[in-house]
Amino acid sequence: GKPVSFIEDCAVPLDHLAEYVDRLTQVFARHGTRGTWYAHASVGTLHVRPILDMRRDGAAKMRAIAEEAAAMVREYKGAFSGEHGDGLVRSEWVGWQFGPRLSRAFEEIKDLFDPAGLTTPGKIVRATRMDDATLFRFPPDHRTHPIRTGLDWSAWNVQSDPATGALTPAGTGGDPA
């Protein structure tokens, strides 16, 4: 698997940060994974990306981990989107952060300025589910096909995704797509 960004923006009050980290680490363990951690502990935001294989059972684990993380963030009176914004991944969690009154106001404003719903569909208002497979770059059943090249690149020790051409340097936690 690879680190997947979907809960990396949660923020909790500093008094609860250590407990949140411990509990979230336990959540990862229950789902057979771990996370990569970095960022701004001084303001209660530790960016974390659970390592998931989105080609297999990653979407189900993503949903379960996100729900548990959201419950903890609510318990600690934190924010599911502390810094980076909401987008497709976190928009479904906006409602409980702002409450029904502001959520309705967001919808009214969106409808006034974008009555056809053409700009940023599924973001902030009338959100799609974060695990909607139709929104994934590659569907869960995506398969790659080996490409035979005319040259031997094995000495370079990199992995190339035949679908995207993206190269993953060895030792960075990547795996072939």
Residue ranges and their predicted role:
Residues 3-33, 54-82, 86-176:
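Phosphate/diphosphate-binding loops
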Residues 34-54, 89-90:
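Histidine-centered divalent-metal-coordination microenvironment in nucleic-acid enzymes
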